[in-house]
Amino acid sequence: MKIIGIEEHFVTADIRAAWAASPIGQEGTGGFDRGEIEMRLDDLGEQRLALMDESGVDVQVLSVTTPALHNLEPEESVILARRTNDLVAATIAKYRTRFQGFATLPTAAPKESCCRT
């Protein structure tokens, strides 16, 4: 039987920068120490795979961490959604048997959210 971790969070440097620059100034990982948890959120490669193996997790379903793109301007959220979804797709392609992913939606741009981003 496979062990599958659902909604396994990650974040990108682009998203962190957007959070910091937003008028709300909400950095979603601000409550984390800038140590191991941040490194785990940033990694979509060998370190994550090693932790999965250590924990007996066969597959992770990747999902950008909260607040995702919810508090960003519509135009910026569309650009970041595309970049993030491309990154997830590339990660899945590289590690086909280990990762799946949820789409990141630009919720500030509802019409764009229903289209491929």
Identify the function of each model-found stretch.
Residues 1-117:
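Helix-coil boundary/capping segments in enzymes
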